[in-house]
Amino acid sequence: MKAPDVRCDVLVIGGGAAGIAAAIAAGRAGARTVLLERYGFLGGLASAAWVGTICGLYLRDTAGAEAVPVSGGFAQEFAARLQKMSGAKPMRVESGLWVLPYQPVNFAQVADAMAGEEKNVTVVLHATVAEAQAQNGRLQRVRALAWNEPLAISPAAVVDCTGEATAAALAGAPAEDGGTDQATALVFVLENVDPALAQRGLLEVRRELRRAVENKILPPICERLSLIPGSAVQGRMAFKLSLFPATPGRPLWEQVTNWERESRALLEPLRKFLAENVPACREARLHSVAPQLGVRSGRRVLGRARLADADVLGVKKSPQGIARGAWPMERWTSSPRPEMTYFAERDYYDIPLDCLRAKELDNVFVAGRCLSAETGAMTSARVIGTALATGWAAGTAAAFQAAGKAMEAAIKETRKDLGRTECKL
């Protein structure tokens, strides 16, 4: 079957938080934009893995009574739309960190609505990239399957928001494997849970789970259970079961397949134990399970610059800064709780545009988990709020390059957007 040849100014691959922002930014800049997404809905892991909270939108503040946005611009516009649809409000969780809770279906609905409002953006769902061809230092063509029909796209510029730098790597861009850096997680929802459990926290649950593990009633992984903040609605609560990091040297596809199957198999024994030993869960039933695991790390492109751990911890500012990071380093390892490394309160670090530009492919930009960063820095910059910001910056830069404009102009435009406080509702 001959693939139709589609020409566009900007091709965005991956419709998660970064990809949505990149496509809308490029479209608003006047670029004919195509957005490819492998699922039948937008939102990426925010929709498919049921992350449940948007981190990175607000400054850390242990004393303040209200959440303070780290910047204006598209990230806050998206958050405002999500709040308007769901009624969600920012909440402080611990150590002065603020998050915006959300329902996964609302995230996908807002993404659909906002992308659909852009006349220059064409969304292609159920689309999987199969090949990326580069020549003379530029990505020239991408071949994909869209609902099992071949599609060939010739873009002027590309934004890789796949979370795994898939297109950039297929085209030969140098990258580093971050797939073993952090543990994955499975989110599931229990119904008929006493709402008081959300107020009391999980101390009682964790005590019982520790006993179950010590007595070999449940496997050790069950101690890694946590409650998703703000998820308690009408007797339903979303829980996160953090798995273990990948084993270096073994194929990731093999490990991910095993994690998906084995973690789901744990849910009924876990639910049964909670029902028998935790009064608040006595009538609990398994309501639903996220369609896929939440993956916290993946392959990262080597960019023209690299966000360093020291840049994050030292809240370094840059005249080339096009996004702001406000979330601490959050490393999920084999420990039951994450290792948090904080920087100064009420402050942020800049992410320079060159961290979003592939080193050896002139027309390839990256955003979200694909950006060029050291391992520790990525544990901060990977969160949804920051991904919305880096996606917007990458989409703007790609549109400017496709139009023959200088990157300095793209930086200026993006920095102006960071100061934008009004939101299109």
Model-inferred region functions:
Residues 25, 31-32, 37-127, 131:
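Conserved N-terminal/central alpha/beta ligand/cofactor-binding core
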Residues 4-16:
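Beta1/beta-strand and adjacent pyrophosphate-binding region of the FAD-binding site
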Residues 11-13, 22, 137:
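Membrane-embedded transmembrane-helix bundle of lipid-linked glycan/lipid transferases
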Residues 133-152:
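Conserved beta-strand-loop-beta-strand element in the redox core of flavoprotein oxidoreductases
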